[in-house]
Amino acid sequence: MGQKINPIGLRLGVNQTWSSRWYADSGEYGRLLHEDLKIRSYVMEELKQAAISKVIIERPHKKCRVTIHSARPGLIIGKKGADIEKLRHQLSEMTNAETSLNIVEIRKPEIDATIIAQSVAQQLERRVAFRRAMKRAVQSAMRLGAEGIRINCSGRLGGAEIARMEWYREGRVPLHTLRADVDYSTAEARTAYGVCGVKVWVFKGEILEHDPMASEHRATRNDNSSSSLNRRRESV
């Protein structure tokens, strides 16, 4: 079962938590969920070059708080904070609520599954050989501290007539072990031959305590142990 299911969904409530953190009445739930999907789609589309890993949405009373985890926070903030103010204003119009923005810098994008998947997909679109792209990503992740990584690429790889799936793995990626901190993400590469899919699993070690926020706390601790602190900006 662990081989098929989404590793993050399998570990929700164990050492992973949700990206949307709010409660709502049954009458409002559908509207707010659809709003969350629109926010994430808009942010990922508008800030493609900012290497965004995840967008966390919280909804305190009649407000909306959006936290963007990015490897390039400077592209989001802009000169003197002009770009982040524009983004905050646009999100406020989408939600019809007072919106605040937090930007969290990812210090080690080489071991973030979402950023790895996006990078491999972008290389495939630029006609880089898929084996070279996968191997480069795997080597970078292992060098930066990942205990294991697996990358799958599927589709008409290299312009082949018949679609197939190729994968590359290094280290160990325990998908059945619930205490394993496994990051997972997917991406699509729109090539001249059709769409190629990219899947990435990154094993970062084991989390022994039962804490749904444990994976996020571990990432934060790793970032704070770096030579420079995370750059954060909040606009209210």
UniProtKB/Swiss-Prot annotation:
Keyword Ribonucleoprotein: yes
Chain's role: Binds the lower part of the 30S subunit head. Binds mRNA in the 70S ribosome, positioning it for translation.
Alphabetically ordered keywords of this record: Ribonucleoprotein, Ribosomal protein, RNA-binding, rRNA-binding
Domain KH type-2: 39-107
UniProt similarity note: Belongs to the universal ribosomal protein uS3 family.
Protein name per the record: Small ribosomal subunit protein uS3
Gene Ontology annotations for the cellular component aspect, listed alphabetically: cytosolic small ribosomal subunit
UniProt gene name: rpsC1
A single MF term (Gene Ontology): mRNA binding
Pfam families, per the entry: KH_2 (PF07650), Ribosomal_S3_C (PF00189)
Subunit structure of this chain's protein: Part of the 30S ribosomal subunit. Forms a tight complex with proteins S10 and S14.
Disulfide bonds: none
Superkingdom as given in the UniProt entry: Bacteria
Record GO biological process: translation
Keyword match Nucleotide-binding: no
Region Disordered, residue ranges: 214-236
